[in-house]
Structures are given as C-alpha cells and as structure tokens.
Amino acid sequence: MMAVILIIAITATISMPLLQEQIAARKIDSIARRLITHAHFARQQALHLGQPVRLAPRLDGQWDGGWSVSSGCMGKQTQGDCIGKIWFSQGKTDPIFFKGGAKHFIDPHTGKTGILFNAAGAAKTAQGGFVANRLILGHQRVPSLERQLILGSGGRWRICNPARDAKRCH
C-alpha cells in the first residue's frame, strides 16, 4: 500500500509542472480567441451599422487593462449631441499580459491605440492605410510561453505559437 502511495506521489510531483504549463497555455489561447472574437464582432457591426466601430484598450492604451468594442461619435464629422455605444467590454487579463508594452495597433497619424473598422469592414488608419500588425501574449507564471495574434492586411486573424511554427510567425 505504501509503495502505491509513493508511486502516485512521485507521478504527481513529476507531472505537476507540465500540467501548470498546459493550463497557462489554455488561458493564453482563451484570451487570444476572445480578442479575435471581439474583433470579428466589431468588424461585423461596422458592416451592419454602416458606420465605424472601434476595438480599443480600455485604460491608457494598455491592452492588459482590457478592451472595449464601441461605435458612434467617430470620424471627422461628429456632432455635439452624439452618443457613443459600448457593445462589449473585457476586463483585466491577469495573469496574461501583452508583451512589448502592448504598443501595437497605434494609428501613426492620430496616435490612438486600437483597431478602427470602417463602414466597409476594413481595418484602416485615419489616412486610409490598411492596418496589419500583431499583439504578443505572455503568461506571468510561465515566461517562456508566448502566442502571437497577427492581423494580416486582408483582415484575417491568426494565432501563432513561435515555439512550434517560427516561420509562420514572421
């Protein structure tokens, strides 16, 4: 009986770090898929409403603090009585963080962080250029773990694991 308990204890001790890494990977994938889902929703709302919809960080341009999908009161001809609408809001993503200070998806002309989908559903800058960029997700407890969210110029999102497919991540 003691031998069985010893074997179970050794097995649990050996497998625990692998289990923790797998849980961390699933958390990163979950946040990545949630962000992509909200981006798809923002694009569809822009198409449906026929007006710009923005996916942007909630706090000071930092994606770690969460993000929101909003519409209304955007563009050059906003009216004073305009009321914006928040469609979705995501809270903090702890223990998942955005590497590189999350200084991605910044419009070079306006300095605003976020993705603006125009009425045609295209992610474009204020000057009409296409947005193509990436966000890199990490986990606080497993620093070696990373996922890259890549938005191509055609509007297609993909999740890339640089540990497995380094060629696709560039």
Q: How should each PLM-predicted stretch be described?
A:
Residues M2, I10, I14-I36, Q44, ...:
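N-terminal helix-rich module
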Residues F41:
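Internal catalytic or translocation cores that form aromatic/hydrophobic pockets or channels
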